[in-house]
Amino acid sequence: MKGFIDDANYSVGLLDEGTNLGNVIDNYVYEHTLTGKNAFFVGDLGKIVKKHSQWQNVVAQIKPFYMVKCNSTPAVLEILAALGTGFACSTKNEMALVQELGVSPENIIYTSPCKQASQIKYAAKVGVNIMTCDNEVELKKIARNHPNAKVLLHIATEDNIGGEDGNMKFGTTLKNCRHLLECAKELDVQIIGVKFHISSACKEYQVYVHALSDARCVFDMAGEFGFTMNMLDIGGGFTGTEIQLEEVNHVISPLLDIYFPEGSGIQIISEPGSYYVSSAFTLAVNIIAKKVVENDKLSSGVEKNGSDEPAFVYYMNDGVYGSFASKLSEDLNTVPEVHKKYKEDEPLFTSSLWGPSCDELDQIVESCLLPELSVGDWLIFDNMGADSLHGPSAFSDTQRPAIYFMMSLSDWYEMQDAGITSDAMMKNFFFAPSCIQLSQEDNFSTEA
């Protein structure tokens, strides 16, 4: 079942109904404890199939174009290609990756807001014509390097998550759209639609109301210049929960019926990323060092159990220069699960979790409550499939984590029922032997 981040020769173990994700993790914790204690991922590809079914059930009118930069492992891309999604690519390498899987150029969008001229030329060479743009400089660059480009104007939204300027970093204003349409007409660049993006952290779904209204205005404006508009891209921003997907759909569905009704010839698309992959990957890390500190030395992110109790700082064999890279740009609001069994009445201590680099930025969890751990113990982080599976940074000399892919037989049958028969992908599946079952009495040593 092992693979690596960019390994096209991965394998996927099919698990019988008596084996679950916990059994798989137990098995590989045991194996890694004996062989080297390296961090590792377990990827449940069945969860990606389930997410696609959920998407089809709730927002079937919107075609997903998966955001490749979120998780570009070959196993993920192959299964999404087999499911029939499109792909949103931000680099030449990402375009090449999905085209190697036989994905049609019509199902690829070049989404980088700041495009290198050579990469625009590459897109033109391989037939990737649809791309986004939000300013005059990019428009002129596209005109010079891609004669067949079909451009989506990226408009800003009122999503203020992430700072006072919010989503204004990318996306043009409604006022500036007329100028860009004039430029496109002069440059003979084809404008075919509009894109906007709303952060998954945004809870004010009224933002969609304004964004869709603005998009309709741009469509009407483009019609004045003679452009034939046929695509609306509502971006990403989907967390992965069915509730959030239904809430967003509840807001946008009636507006789409009003502004972009069925039969109008306008294709509605989106760019989900973490929606598909976040919950599909679990990361297991090992405690490599430990330090006892005074309780008040740690930040007061959790309630103290008593001023005389110690607090613990733990260092793990993976950090922000590896699988937790997204921690550098966003908060990681998660408390890991302790792999070893401990008693319900075992005392919990204020704890802080750090990566191995000794860099002050390499703090993974500022403060949480955990039982006292030992060097060699394992911690399990769920929902690690998005923006985590990158090669190690030059700052870190740690080995990149292996990925163990799995799928339950029930998910396998569901995939067959969905008509997925890609020979290239099917050759990677095999029936896995039952995982090692460790009882509570099995107490193998974890000390380094």
UniProtKB/Swiss-Prot annotation:
Alphabetical list of InterPro entries matching this protein = Ala_racemase/Decarboxylase_C (IPR009006), Azin1 (IPR031178), De-COase2_C (IPR022643), De-COase2_CS (IPR022657), De-COase2_N (IPR022644), Orn/DAP/Arg_de-COase (IPR000183), Orn_de-COase (IPR002433), PLP-binding_barrel (IPR029066)
Keywords (alphabetical) are: Nucleus, Polyamine biosynthesis, Ubl conjugation
One Gene Ontology biological process? positive regulation of centrosome duplication
Question: Where does the protein end up?
Answer: Nucleus
Q: Does the keyword Lipid metabolism apply?
A: no
- SUPFAM superfamilies according to UniProt: Alanine racemase C-terminal domain-like (SSF50621), PLP-binding barrel (SSF51419)
Is the Nucleus keyword given for this protein?
A: yes
Q: Name one GO molecular function term.
A: ornithine decarboxylase activity
According to its UniProt record, in which tissues is this protein expressed?
Expressed in various tissues including liver, heart and kidney.
In what way is this protein post-translationally modified? Ubiquitinated, leading to its proteasomal degradation; a process that is reduced in presence of antizyme OAZ1.
Q: Which residues bear the site annotation Not modified?
A: 69
Domain of life (superkingdom)? Eukaryota
Signal peptide limits: none
Grouped into one coarse class, the protein's main location is nucleus
Gene Ontology annotations for the cellular component aspect, listed alphabetically:
centrosome; cytoplasm; nucleus
Role summary: Antizyme inhibitor (AZI) protein that positively regulates ornithine decarboxylase (ODC) activity and polyamine uptake. AZI is an enzymatically inactive ODC homolog that counteracts the negative effect of ODC antizymes (AZs) OAZ1, OAZ2 and OAZ3 on ODC activity by competing with ODC for antizyme-binding. Inhibits antizyme-dependent ODC degradation and releases ODC monomers from their inactive complex with antizymes, leading to formation of the catalytically active ODC homodimer and restoring polyamine production.
Similarity comment text for this entry: Belongs to the Orn/Lys/Arg decarboxylase class-II family. ODC antizyme inhibitor subfamily.
Q: How does it assemble?
A: Monomer. Interacts with OAZ1 and OAZ3; this interaction disrupts the interaction between the antizyme and ODC1.
Protein name (record): Antizyme inhibitor 1
The species is Rattus norvegicus
Q: Which gene encodes it?
A: Azin1
